[in-house]
Amino acid sequence: MKISICILLVVTTLAVYWPTQDHEFINYDDKEYITENWNVKSKLTQDSITWAFTTSHAANWHPITWLSHMVDYQFYGSNPKGHHLTNLFFHTANALLLFFILFRMTGTLWQSGFVAALFALHPFNVESVAWVAERKSVLSTFFWFLTMWAYIHYSKKPGVKRYSLVALLFALGLMSKPMLVTLPFVLLMMDYWPLRRLRFEQDEGPEEITENYSGKKLEFWHLVWEKFPLILLTTGSSIATVIVQRSGGALQNIEAFSLSARFTNAMVSYLDYLKKAVWPEGLAVFYPHPGNALEVWKGVLCAIALVAISAVAIKFIRKAPYFAFGWFWYLGTLAPVIGVVQVGGQAMADRYAYVPLIGIFIIVAWGVPELLAKWRH
């Protein structure tokens, strides 16, 4: 059955996104990243590789992403078909990795397949796949999932070699897109559910996992300390990102967007992402930031709603750990791009939801069957 689900994921993903191979490059960042970037068009040379690791071009430091574009140009030149197919390859691989990761952690076939299918086919993710310049999203997520896989392997039998692989894959992900700064937080949540490396005495949650961790229940602060090397990598990546975004003029100052405008937009955006996830209409390449035109009371109401949902998630964390895991995955992974630290002039962006919505998909996949089972009884 696992093979059937994998085949179905591959076939449906390719069927939906195959037309992208006939798309051209566009004038929104594709020039800056590929068609008019002479370092990328130089292909893989000593100078271009050095440039990839030292440049702040496009107000980002993501050398692995630059190298991937150079490899594409090495094989496909200026033909956009190959560049689009590379994005599609990574997105398809990501869907398969997500399925295997969830299945390995939880042992539940259909829920894992459902989450992977939503991830593969949700309209919110079209921007990340169909836009060549957004290679960094699909590439960094590829390393995100590989890091999770390596961490699961490490949790079964902790050791330096296994942890080194986790750190290496995490570093490659950070060098693809700094969105991975929240991954140590996700790994810590995984320690509670589904890996069960941390468990309270009164836990009542389901025992999906028996063989996929070391069997040792560890103290919370021990697990936090375990993530310290990853936190160091996160800190370094964050500092580098702030420096290059500030030097590139992407980081907005308080005069451009006040603190109240940032807070209000951030709170409203959290719920707007959810609304578009449920009913994906009005998707756009750019959502202008409303600035002070957005009433503060809307932000306050949205903040109250977010706190209320978070309180419910914590209250039922032992009976429904998947709900807390999915909800805080969503809140946490979206936090770096929610707009408190404002980069650019957008209020939100479809590409920012590529990883965060996985948390919501997990809530739906595990929550709906559980609710239906309770209603039947």
Annotate each PLM feature.
Residues 1-377:
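Polytopic membrane enzymes that build or remodel cell-surface glycoconjugates and lipids
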